[in-house]
């Protein structure tokens, strides 16, 4: 079982992949998303998105600046204003 994760900026699609879990720096605090998470939307603050490719794996950190996150039946989409790297 996996979560479909997409990271998008106004300029390009940065990531589109299947992962175990993603932790997002929401403006009201960090939140983790696994497959089957209830749908919701949140604004994203500047910080690191942590991508866990498998259970127990060390996270890959992706620095983002602002944006929105949407969790739906299709997975997690983060629309970031800017992604470093």
Curated annotation (Swiss-Prot):
It is a peripheral membrane protein. The keyword Membrane applies. It comes from the Bacteria. Its main location: membrane. It is found in: Cell inner membrane. InterPro entries: ATP_synth_F1_dsu/esu, ATP_synth_F1_dsu/esu_N, ATPsynth_dsu/esu_N. Keywords: ATP synthesis, Cell inner membrane, Cell membrane, CF(1), Hydrogen ion transport, Ion transport, Membrane, Transport. One of its GO terms (cellular component) is proton-transporting ATP synthase complex. The keyword Cell membrane applies. Coiled coil: none annotated. One of its GO terms (molecular function) is proton-transporting ATP synthase activity, rotational mechanism. F-type ATPases have 2 components, CF(1) - the catalytic core - and CF(0) - the membrane proton channel. CF(1) has five subunits: alpha(3), beta(3), gamma(1), delta(1), epsilon(1). CF(0) has three main subunits: a, b and c. Belongs to the ATPase epsilon chain family. Produces ATP from ADP in the presence of a proton gradient across the membrane. This is ATP synthase epsilon chain. It comes from Novosphingobium aromaticivorans (strain ATCC 700278 / DSM 12444 / CCUG 56034 / CIP 105152 / NBRC 16084 / F199).
């Amino acid at each position: 079982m996996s979560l479909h994760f997409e990271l998008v900026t106004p300029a390009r699609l940065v990531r589109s992949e299947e992962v175990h879990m993603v932790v997002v720096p929401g403006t009201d605090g960090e939140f983790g998303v696994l497959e089957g998470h209830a749908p919701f939307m949140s604004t994203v603050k500047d910080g690191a998105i942590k991508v866990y490719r498998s259970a127990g794996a060390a996270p890959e950190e992706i620095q983002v600046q602002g944006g929105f996150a949407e969790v739906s039946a299709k997975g997690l989409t983060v629309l970031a204003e800017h992604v470093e790297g």
